[in-house]
Amino acid sequence: MADKELKFLVVDDFSTMRRIVRNLLKELGFNNVEEAEDGLDALNKLQAGGYGFVISDWNMPNMDGLELLKTIRADGAMSALPVLMVTAEAKKENIIAAAQAGASGYVVKPFTAATLEEKLNKIFEKLGM
């Protein structure tokens, strides 16, 4: 089981969605959660350090989730950070693009708490967390 003190960054331009994900994480025992409203905001926070997991939307202003993912993977200090994409983009080509860019997992909105928990556990297991 993953460390319950693991620090999450939830990235979504829609504040209600950030709150939903934060509350679901809280239900799963993860209380160390911060938020960012787009990829640029997220990048600034991530570069300050201390985060152990990113949950990001795809469609956002300034820097979308795919660009954020590519930037994280290209940065030596952050390249191993797990990134779960949570998005309304359900098209096969989007899922493939996210996988090719290095997404740790992919969840299509709307989703249940059970789906989020299952994806997180798969990522934790794969990373030995």
From Swiss-Prot:
Cited InterPro entries: CheY-like_superfamily, Sig_transdc_resp-reg_receiver, ST_Response_Regulator
Taxonomy, superkingdom: Bacteria
Residues that hold Mg(2+) according to the record: 12-13, 57, 59
Record's cofactor remark: Binds 1 Mg(2+) ion per subunit.
Disulphide bonds in the chain: none
Modified residues (N6-acetyllysine): 92, 109
Compartments reported by the entry: Cytoplasm
Domain Response regulatory span(s) in chain numbering: 7-124
Cross-referenced Gene3D superfamilies: 3.40.50.2300
Main location group: cytoplasm
Cofactor: Mg(2+)
Designated name of the protein: Chemotaxis protein CheY
Organism: Escherichia coli O6:H1 (strain CFT073 / ATCC 700928 / UPEC)
